[in-house]
Curated annotation (Swiss-Prot):
PANTHER family to which the protein is assigned, alphabetical: ATP-DEPENDENT RNA HELICASE DBPA, ATP-DEPENDENT RNA HELICASE RHLE-RELATED
This protein's UniProt keywords: ATP-binding, Helicase, Hydrolase, Nucleotide-binding, Nucleus, Phosphoprotein, Ribosome biogenesis, RNA-binding, rRNA processing
UniProt-recorded name of the protein: ATP-dependent RNA helicase MAK5
Biased composition (Acidic residues): 83-99
Motif DEAD box mapped to chain: 333-336
Amino acid sequence: MGKKRAPQKGKTVTKPQEIIVDESKLNWKPVDIPDTLDDFGGFYGLEEIDGVDVKVVDGKVTFVTKKDSKVLKDSNKEKVGDDQESVENESGSDSESELLEFKNLDDIKEGELSAASYSSSDEDEQGNIESSKLTDPSEDVDEDVDEDVLKENVFNKDINIDDISPVNLPEWTNLAPLSMTILQSLQNLNFLRPTEIQKKSIPVIMQGVDVMGKASTGSGKTLAYGIPIVEKLISNFSQKNKKPISLIFTPTRELAHQVTDHLKKICEPVLAKSQYSILSLTGGLSIQKQQRLLKYDNSGQIVIATPGRFLELLEKDNTLIKRFSKVNTLILDEADRLLQDGHFDEFEKIIKHLLVERRKNRENSEGSSKIWQTLIFSATFSIDLFDKLSSSRQVKDRRFKNNEDELNAVIQHLMSKIHFNSKPVIIDTNPESKVSSQIKESLIECPPLERDLYCYYFLTMFPGTTLIFCNAIDSVKKLTVYLNNLGIPAFQIHSSMTQKNRLKSLERFKQQSAKQKTINHSNPDSVQLSTVLIASDVAARGLDIPGVQHVIHYHLPRSTDIYIHRSGRTARAGSEGVSAMICSPQESMGPLRKLRKTLATKNSVSTDLNSRSTNRKPIKWQNTVPLLPIETDILSQLRERSRLAGELADHEIASNSLRKDDNWLKKAADELGIDVDSDEDDISKSNSDTFLLKNKNKKMQKTINKDKVKAMRATLNELLSVPIRKDRRQKYLTGGLVNLADNLVKKRGHNSIIGHEKTNALETLKKKKKRNN
């Protein structure tokens, strides 16, 4: 068998105090939740462990424990415990290693081999197997450190070609020299060809010039500027001293998170080892966590932020000013909103901080006089939107011959606010139409106090994924409760909600919408329900919610640009959608008239296909939007349901508000040591609290006693169980123009209305347009 090797003399084995362990090898214990705890906030299935320390290095969490293996699973004790103890006896370890050395590989048990190669698995995978001696524990720690170093250079090693599917995107490859990472991601996301704004923007942006892009909603503006900056991120990944690549500013938090998600999807392989390279910094979330993430290596190379939170971070840490002053690209998404009141002051301070620091760096290094590349994108660029910012009346008195002259005026105004390297290149993919041609607009005329009823009618007649916009937060809250009382899944999002609750509500809406689509696809004969998201204008800009079929304007928007962005939540990525306005007669003579006149293009003309006359007359604003047909017999059957649901919604909201007011008053009184009951009479007599008393009395009038609430709910449930019938037909199912018996047997017709054909809002408007033509 050969001679035994003599043990090496003079060699001392150091016993490490700690070892790094994988979390899957730890003996986790489930956390017992007490029965008296009502709400655990969704944290179920938690596990805990003692005797383990947690260390975070560059965002990577590692678990460290001492050499006793009590915290390890039984399968790992043999591996870590016994083998490491045997290292203390050199002769014992040598003899065991020799036995393993001269064994046939077929005779070696799986446990022995794993124990022998526990700390050198990486070397075995490369085929460089050294002697099968048990490795010294001190070498375990050193090799773990070496592994981390290798992971940082993961992009320098060879790529397994078998893991990459062939890319066949000729339109993308002909557009610009894009990396394989981006092309692979575009193919996986099924973005097979670029949109119009992407075709015109990406090559120009990659040349480093300033760009001002205008395109309709849902046209792919995010990737138009996102692909070039992600290309820079990929090309700079191997550099050690990485400078920030891009700053992207958005007007809303939701839009910032959405842009972050879109950029991460097209560079997932890059983020696998540096997950914080693309970072979202918005309000409503922990600023301490954001400060900690910015300190990680290679983090924040692309930052998507709202101006308020980013300014707060800069003012708290001056090193961030120096760091982000070296940025290469500055991007303004939805720039028209960013430069309006409320955002521009913060944005101007940010630009001032960065420019001052950049000039200092340029003077010290004698670098180029060129500042960052500036990219501006929006769906609406109109000079009217900048009137509040301008102190000159010359802008208001201007009249423009065409759209290009108006955009040039906007650029002149922007150049006084934003620092460009030169006059930006204008890329306008919809010079004439302001609303996307894929959106079919419609008008619903209703009495001013019956908006809820007509909204319920639309959702019953045209079920689907619907987004409803309201001007007031109180309307959002009431409409949500109202629709839930009628059995329609409704979710809400508005500015009074915390950021966490906003994101949670959006996620629930998407899940419910996907669930309903799955049910309808698997069982087309099932009753189709509408899935509704009710929102204030906080969700009007930029949000890409997949599958929204209808947008309802519960109130007319306050400005034209808000209407354009609201309507743009449907008809995304080339699909079609419906935008319906609920309008009272009083609104039609004022706000509606102004809205339609502003939206009317200069080239809007009547198109008569049979007439060859060149004298075409402009279309009147009244004829630019068709009326949605309303069937009064169905509406009358919904009226009583709507009344009961509305009263119950008012009661629920008023009761919750009164309860919150009482709890707040009692809490404040306890903190001040005041007896609330003794002071109630004095408060009621005080003239200074007249407004509070009126508000309280108004809420009290909307409340209903418990017995009446139960009776109303029972009546409402009974009405909801009765199917709606077209023309109120209840007898002679085989008579009339439509054979109801035949439709019921063959499961044809509307799923919610007996005797009615299947309806689709989009097809209804298309048919009406054809009849009018």
